[in-house]
Amino acid sequence: LVVLGMTGTGATILSELLAQDPANRPLMKWERLSCCPPPEAASFRSDPRIAKAVGEVEFQYEMVPELRAVHYEPGDGPTECVALLGQSFYSQDWLGLFRVPTFVDWYRHCDKGPAYEYHHLALQLLQSRTGGRWSAVTRCAGPTG
């Protein structure tokens, strides 16, 4: 199940709702922050990486308190797949972090196929020991993608 939504349309809350269905397998924030080794089914809810991710996210909210109200995404909850695309640098997230006109131009015209191939492989890796049906939520590329 893949859900696409423009920024600010509720895709994040939809990912939370889809994650409530035990048949769905969302990408978890802690997995995205630390993909390897892939999680084990037996320790999926108690993996030590969860506490680390929760701490990292809480630190981020301490540094920028307004962020919690604008985009709340707990370290032990689901996250958008756009984060995996960022690992291959084919993500619109990079456009908002730095002002690099040459990157913007490259991103607008590049072949994004390799990014989705990487995304597919990353999801396969993460699912290799846990199984389940993915419920992937991501933002649309918008005018720059």
Task: Mark where each language-model region is.
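Conserved alpha/beta-hydrolase fold motif
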Residues: 3, 135-136
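PAPS-dependent sulfation machinery
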Residues: 33-135
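Short beta-strand-centered segment that lines the nucleotide-binding/catalytic pocket of NTP-utilizing
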Residues: 25-34
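Glycine-rich phosphate-binding P-loop
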Residues: 2-24
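ATP-dependent NMP and nucleoside kinases share a basic, alpha-helical "lid"
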Residues: 138-145
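Hydrophobic/aromatic-lined pockets within catalytic cores
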Residues: 19-26, 124-127, 131, 144
